[in-house]
Amino acid sequence: MGPNPMKMYPIEGNKSVQFIKPILEKLENVEVGEYSYYDSKNGETFDKQILYHYPILNDKLKIGKFCSIGPGVTIIMNGANHRMDGSTYPFNLFGNGWEKHMPKLDQLPIKGDTIIGNDVWIGKDVVIMPGVKIGDGAIVAANSVVVKDIAPYMLAGGNPANEIKQRFDQDTINQLLDIKWWNWPIDIINENIDKILDNSIIREVIWKK
């Protein structure tokens, strides 16, 4: 029961909605969970939305399970960063003698890994900047630019994106983070989808590892 998480296009006849694990798992320094999907604008695959991700920098992109990623979402990785201790112009890119001015890694503002949690909803045309961590269950409003971390189960939006409000009270959030339903075996998830959708899973112990 349920769709095959390794089938790129899980909806018959629909080439816009795509599970991203089979697309991204072949990329270096990328980890992605099952059932996370991208709703593309024009059929572009989600790997095209990850920019400036160069293996030499060794920064990782981690995306959890059951994430909903809207059209046009772009993830900017650390390779986009320029030196900022003087001129930001990348002279070395253009060769012809300028290549000798290649910056050292410790001269670049490397922000670390970019991490998107589980059950995260990212709206249309959101831009996620390098090194950001978006917590489990968070929602990011359309057209936002995420430049700093977003806490679990937080609604955030704007340019730059700010945390607007918690989706639930702190006790409920703590229970959801303890339950971690996205890590349940898929047969247990299948049996409890309605309870996952209305949050009644926090009122009973359904499954414990």
UniProtKB/Swiss-Prot annotation:
Keywords: Acyltransferase, Antibiotic resistance, Repeat, Transferase. The keyword Secreted does not apply. Its EC number is 2.3.1.-. GO terms for biological process: response to antibiotic. Gene3D superfamilies: Hexapeptide repeat proteins. InterPro entries: Hexapep, Hexapep_transf_CS, Trans_hexapeptide_repeat, Trimer_LpxA-like_sf. It holds the Pfam family Hexapep. The active site is at H82. GO terms for molecular function: acyltransferase activity. Belongs to the transferase hexapeptide repeat family. Inactivates the A compounds of streptogramin antibiotics by acetylation, thus providing resistance to these antibiotics. Homohexamer. This is Streptogramin A acetyltransferase. The gene is vatD.
